[in-house]
Regions:
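N-terminal membrane-anchoring alpha-helices
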Residues: 2-57
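Compositionally biased, low-hydrophobicity segments enriched in charged and small polar residues
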Residues: 1-9, 159, 171-173
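Active-site and donor-binding regions of nucleotide-sugar-utilizing enzymes
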Residues: 36-185
Length: 185
């Protein structure tokens, strides 16, 4: 079976998924003011944090060429696991841009440290946008990935849904997941 052709899910599963997704959107929307408050607090506490707040809203500083790879590594551990993957992708696809997203400042710092000579040379870093439709859509429209690779099991519902809707295959790398859990995605 190819990556793009997937068996159709039963209607009951689709309905449950739709309800769960809708509840997630409502809950996330209610919590959005807290996320913005946290951003503001962190930017006051660490002024350098303010310089990259826009990335959490889906706005990237440097737009890579369309059709590249989006690889997400949450924090330090995932970044350490991702660097060999990034280097292997670079060898296999030397001209394809790779956008690496992280969620934490420590993950960002570790990525910058480990790929210091390669960042900017068709490898880009951005903070991952908050998992809300507008922010993820903005990010996807700017980065225009041909594939989304997630390190471990950092699967965000809106991101996965919008990737699927835009025809961007989602690959989970270096993860442990039961067959039952995998069916939910």
């Amino acid at each position: 079976m190819s990556v793009t052709s997937q068996p159709s899910l039963p209607l009951a599963v689709k309905a449950k998924s739709f309800v769960a997704y809708s509840l997630y959107i409502v809950l996330f929307s209610c919590l959005l003011p807290l996320f913005f408050g946290r951003l503001l607090y962190r930017s006051i506490k660490a002024p350098a944090y303010r310089l990259r707040m826009h990335e959490r809203l889906g706005l990237v500083a440097t737009k890579p060429a369309a059709g590249g790879i989006w690889l997400h590594a949450v924090s330090v551990g995932e970044v350490i696991a991702a660097v060999p993957v990034i280097k292997a992708l670079r060898l296999q696809y030397p001209l394809m841009p790779i956008t690496v997203t992280t969620t934490t400042p420590t993950g960002s710092a570790r990525l910058t440290e480990m790929l210091a000579d390669e960042l900017g040379n068709n490898i880009f870093h951005s903070y991952s946008p908050y998992d809300w439709p507008l922010f993820v859509s903005l990010f996807l429209r700017q980065v225009k990935p041909s594939i989304y690779i997630v390190m471990e099991t950092e699967l965000w519902p809106v991101t996965v849904y919008l990737c699927k809707r835009m025809g961007v295959p989602v690959i989970v790398a270096n993860a442990r997941m039961s067959a039952k859990s995998a069916k939910g995605y």
